[in-house]
């Protein structure tokens, strides 16, 4: 089993090329395999929520791009399901959350849970990267995260498929639950 990236062959995310190459190598190897093309993890954004609370703003560069993220647990359950059922193996799955959201909607969800307004502030990609670097992230990581947000604005992290919830036999974890866990 290989965990890849949602819509890897068509993705403009900087990390797509290595996933596409790995998928090609697996196909050429003749070894039986299953590919789980995971969408974004909701925790990718949830881990920044304590800082958003501290600074009274959630910042990003995703504009109003829809993000079809799912919780890490959802992806883990899908992998376990496929590993335990030979009938599900040998395929490629495009996995994403049932509930898409914008970063403004994430900020609104956070605001509702803490009882105070935490706005989403959208900024240009370079400014967002600079803000992340200023907060202590290494420049390469800050640039990568800003690039991912900018690509989200173009729809790269959006998907309407429900293969993930079909595999796990339930709806994917709601955004509100991941937010609650992050601010615990």
Predicted segments, located by residue:
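Catalytic nucleophile serine of serine hydrolases
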Residues: 4-5, 171
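Oxidoreductase cofactor-interface core, primarily capturing Rossmann-like NAD(P)-dependent enzymes
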Residues: 5-119, 123-126, 130-135, 140-141, ...
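C-terminal accessory subdomains/tails of enzymes that are appended
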Residues: 117, 166-167
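Amphipathic terminal alpha-helices
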Residues: 163, 171-184
